[in-house]
């Protein structure tokens, strides 16, 4: 019999954005860079553009203001994400061999008998070149809750793909 989480806890977690420790650190570094480097540089660029006269026909000024809007929007977005982040350390997961957010899985594609290794991460961390797949991807959704030896069926553009779970790691 599977243990079920209380509904209130599930709802609370669902309001949070799951991030690995590394993913949260990357967002914090980007936020720090935007605030300490990019924001001051664009403020300086706007001040410089103002010295060039009529603002209504000043392309430099318009470009700098547009960039400022982008930077301020990204700062706001990062601050919001970090404020609602649920940071998960894969090394502290006790999922008894089940595939959960943050874990690394070794899979065998049953069609061509090749093995792949993925870490299941948040949307902002996903990078297929680095073998990090989003928790919201079709393959992750098919894998969550599976254990070693289980077979997951994934709806792919070319049809259904089957993957056998070879290993589940919490690293």
Each model region followed by its residue ranges:
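Amphipathic alpha-helical coiled-coil segments
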Residues: 72-86
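Short, intrinsically disordered, mixed-charge
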Residues: 33-36, 70, 80, 141-148
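Helix-rich terminal scaffold detector
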Residues: 1-72, 76
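Non-DNA-binding regulatory cores of transcription-related proteins
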Residues: 88-169
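Elongated periplasmic alpha-helical coiled-coil
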Residues: 50-52, 84-87
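Generic alpha-helical hydrophobic packing signal
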Residues: 28-30, 65-68, 81, 115, ...
């Amino acid at each position: 019999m599977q243990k079920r989480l209380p509904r209130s806890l599930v709802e609370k977690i669902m309001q949070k954005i799951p991030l690995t420790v590394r993913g949260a650190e990357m967002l914090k570094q980007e936020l720090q860079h935007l605030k300490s480097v990019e924001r001051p540089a664009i403020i300086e660029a706007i001040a410089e553009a103002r010295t060039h006269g009529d603002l209504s026909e000043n392309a430099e000024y318009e470009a700098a203001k547009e960039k400022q809007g982008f930077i301020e929007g990204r700062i706001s977005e990062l601050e919001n994400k970090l404020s609602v982040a649920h940071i998960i350390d894969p090394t502290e997961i006790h999922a008894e061999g089940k595939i959960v957010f943050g874990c690394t899985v070794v899979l065998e594609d049953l069609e061509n008998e090749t093995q792949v290794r993925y870490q299941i991460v948040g949307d902002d961390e996903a990078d297929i070149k680095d073998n990090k797949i989003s928790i919201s991807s079709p393959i992750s959704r098919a894998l969550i809750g599976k254990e070693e030896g289980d077979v997951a069926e994934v709806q792919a553009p070319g049809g259904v793909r089957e993957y056998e779970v070879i290993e589940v790691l919490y690293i």
